[in-house]
Regions:
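Hydrophobic aliphatic residue packing
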Residues: 1-2, 127
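Contiguous alpha-helical scaffold segments within structured protein domains
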Residues: 3-79, 151
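Glycine-rich, small/acidic residue-mixed loop/short-helix segments
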Residues: 67-73, 77-152
Length: 152
């Protein structure tokens, strides 16, 4: 929903400002389709000449979309609540070149192969007002889109 998307966008922009990055550009919200699911996407770009990409990544990740807010309190809560290894779920992935250019995304669904078995992982954001049944349906759609990539 747009409210959730705006919450994450505002979090990212506030953290850019915290790092004294003021010359950012925020694009328009667009709908991106992935298999049988659509996501709201907003490109945020900035010139970060003197900041190591990994410092920036550490400050921005994890965002409220995959962790909660405030970040430290949410991380502690998730650690106490979850009894499984998230693996690479919700991890940033991307590249950095020798000139310091970088491009990172967040893996909102993933798969890994362990001991000859494939394991899929996907999640959903629960916020005040979320309807759990709809969130479960969303997770099922995400998992189906992964399975379709592998098995179709």
């Amino acid at each position: 929903c747009i409210r959730d998307s705006n919450f994450v966008i505002n979090y990212l922009i506030e953290n850019l400002k915290f790092l004294n990055i003021r010359n950012y550009k925020k694009g328009e919200i667009k709908i991106k389709k992935f298999g049988n699911i659509a996501h709201l996407c907003t490109l945020i770009s900035a010139e970060v000449n003197k900041i190591c990409p990994f410092v920036l990544l550490e400050k921005l990740h994890p965002s409220p979309a995959v962790c909660g807010f405030p970040k430290e309190k949410a991380l502690d809560y998730l650690d106490s609540l979850e009894n499984f290894d998230r693996g690479n779920y919700a991890s940033p992935f991307g590249w950095v070149d020798v000139e310091g250019n970088a491009d990172f995304r967040v893996a909102l669904r993933g798969a890994r192969i362990l001991n000859g078995e494939i394991e899929f992982i996907a999640g959903s954001g629960l916020v005040k007002g979320s309807i759990c049944e709809k969130e479960i349906d969303e997770i099922k759609l995400k998992l189906a889109s992964l399975a379709n990539l592998i098995f179709d």
